[in-house]
């Protein structure tokens, strides 16, 4: 979106956000599929993400009680940004970020396949307008 083109610290924050979300998926999978110990998960988070041990501990304890939540969150983010990229590519100058967000966020919490259809319908409505 070009949001951080002139903001190196903002870009760094965004990249940190992506790293954190990716590491959450690794830790969630490590705990629930690879049977990592609590300590292994905390150590991974500290080493890979640079988080303080106390923060990493709280995050790991949360993932222990909600299997798959971290991965589903990241999947939702990936699908959402994919829908937005598709809309921008198909609509070009007719793409309006505010209208896009209104359309896809108005459906609330919804399965990702439904969200994809909402995005596709919104794109189609803008192409014919």
Question: Would you name each region that the model predicts?
Answer:
Residues 1-129:
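N-terminal maturation segment of proteins
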